[in-house]
Amino acid sequence: MIALHLDLRAKPAAGPALEKTFREVFRPAVSAQQGFVDTALLRPSSEKDAYRLVIAFETEASRLKWVGTDLHQQVWPQIEAHCAGYEAKGFEVV
């Protein structure tokens, strides 16, 4: 299993919109993908504009297949629209 962690920095006052987009757009889209395991949007209690998006797939090939879909090209920009920037790091779950 692989897990992708994306540290997102929401634009000022965009946190609620980012959370809504995750719940209503991104999570339903990614959860329907073959090989999908789990996703969560985490917000540290001490930082209002910082988030961690965690996405897990059975394999890296499954994740890359999702990234290559038209649906991903529709929903990911909706997440990015609420962000000032982000950094991603991939992990193998052991």
Describe the role of every protein-language-model region.
Residues 20, 44-50, 78-85, 93-94:
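Noncatalytic linker/hinge segments flanking ATPase motor cores
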Residues 1-3, 18, 34-36:
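Short, flexible segments with low predicted structural confidence
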Residues 24-37, 56-90:
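An amphipathic, aromatic/His-enriched active-site/gating alpha helix that lines ligand/cofactor pockets
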Residues 9-22:
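Short, surface-exposed ligand-recognition loops at beta-strand->loop->(often short) alpha-helix junctions
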Residues 2-9, 40-67, 92:
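Short, well-ordered beta-strand segments in beta-rich or mixed alpha/beta enzyme
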